[in-house]
Amino acid sequence: MTTESAPVLVVGATGLQGGATARALLTSGVAVRALVRDPATDRAKAVEALGAELVTGDLDDRDSLTRAAQGARAVFSVQMPDLNGRGFDGEVDQAVNLIEAARAAGVPQFVHTSVSGAGQHADRVAGEWSWMEPYYAAKAGIQDRVRAAGFTHWTLIKPGFFMENLRPSVEIVFPRGVEGGLVTLLKPTTRLSLVAVDDIGTVAAAAVAEPERFHGVELELASDHLTMTEIAKVLSHSLGVELTAPDMTQEEATAAGMPDMGFGQAQLNEYPQPARPEFARALGIPLTSLEEWAHAHLRSTA
């Protein structure tokens, strides 16, 4: 099997980032081997229907990962905090398992997705934001391991705030539904580094297509960079509901139904994410504006 015909092992292919990467690779003619825990699930079957090969494995089982990575030209890596007790330590453990498995299998390229600002976060976790230090430390620690692992080629993708979090079905910003308006601790003038998840897949596919050009690239990825007032205007147009950018206290947001996971938003008022669209454009990456994303994904919900 030549390198060009070898598959890319995609972690999280049934999720947002891995799914976007699997679709982008398949569209470009690259074979995809999707790591799944249960190939019988509807989500796994949907990935298979796109043309991906399913391989059973678990990020907590290094041997299963080594088997899954055999013969792969690259690995796309994504992990989330372990919600079953290990928290951010579990996220790091899973990343280490995947990195070590890929090295043991002789995979030459590793593309990992992290988060904007990881590794540049010392100021972000000072004072009232110290509770976020474990989150950023885990992301930065995984990045360090990727750099030091010895892959022939590696790339770090560091995306900003997902546009997908602006869907009406997501309680982070619409806990009361569209009619209840936006609920956020972000100030109207705060600019968000927004990312369309499909653009993460576009970057990953570009890195696989040109591993030497993307070797060592640490891309602070944003598809758009808008204030909350501008975001509200775009959403209003697509949803057909007049929305404004609120200026809420934490107490007001809590009373409006914002879940606890939304509290970290306020950090971005003081420490914006460094991701910017011009970084991806400099690499020739086509991007999706919020207006384009909203037109494609929100109009049917209006």
Question: Regions from the language model: what does each represent?
Answer:
Residues T2-A46, D60-D63, R67-V92, E100-F110, ...:
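Oxidoreductase cofactor-interface core, primarily capturing Rossmann-like NAD(P)-dependent enzymes
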Residues V47-A49, L182, M261-A266:
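Generic hydrophobic, helix-prone segments enriched in Leu/Val/Ile
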Residues G57:
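Cofactor-binding loops of NAD(P)H-dependent oxidoreductases
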Residues T244-D247:
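Short beta-strand-to-loop elements that line the ligand-binding cleft
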Residues A24, F214-H215, L239, Q250-A302:
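A hydrophobic C-terminal alpha-helical subdomain
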Residues G51-A52, W154:
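Short, conserved active-site loop motifs that form the nucleotide-linked donor/cofactor pocket
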